[in-house]
């Protein structure tokens, strides 16, 4: 599912809302999650999961094409840990 499909589904399930309002809400939620992660905060959606940022240390990598050693800079990457309700649903256990 992509963002536009999510917006369409939510609009269909909530006919009292205009699609452009649903789009604003979805975009606002994503922006708030991104802003919180950029600030170094953890975002927890109970039952669904938690988003956080992990630091990857600098390291020496290898170019797979040439075999040459390359320096990979330190970076921060998003991390998602699925919540219990999500894991249970994916494994066929209804909650």
Curated annotation (Swiss-Prot):
Record GO cellular component, one term: chromosome
GO molecular function: DNA binding; structural constituent of chromatin
GO biological process: DNA recombination; regulation of DNA-templated transcription; regulation of translation
Keyword Transcription tagged: yes
Keyword tags: DNA recombination, DNA-binding, Transcription, Transcription regulation, Translation regulation
InterPro entries per the UniProt record, alphabetical: Hist_DNA-bd, Histone-like_DNA-bd_CS, IHF-like_DNA-bd_dom_sf, IHF_beta
UniProt cross-references to CDD domains, sorted A to Z: IHF_B
Recorded family membership: Belongs to the bacterial histone-like protein family.
Reported function: This protein is one of the two subunits of integration host factor, a specific DNA-binding protein that functions in genetic recombination as well as in transcriptional and translational control.
Assembly description: Heterodimer of an alpha and a beta chain.
Cited NCBIfam families: hip, PRK00199.1
Protein's name in the database: Integration host factor subunit beta
The organism of origin for this protein: Jannaschia sp. (strain CCS1)
């Amino acid at each position: 599912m992509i963002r536009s499909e999510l917006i369409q589904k939510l609009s269909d399930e909530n006919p009292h809302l205009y699609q452009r309002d649903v789009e604003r809400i979805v975009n606002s939620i994503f922006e708030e999650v991104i802003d919180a992660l950029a600030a170094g905060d953890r975002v927890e959606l109970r039952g669904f999961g938690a988003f956080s940022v992990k630091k990857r240390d600098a390291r020496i990598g290898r170019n797979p094409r040439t075999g040459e050693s390359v320096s990979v800079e330190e970076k921060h990457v998003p991390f998602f840990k699925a919540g219990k309700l999500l894991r249970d649903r994916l494994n066929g256990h209804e909650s």
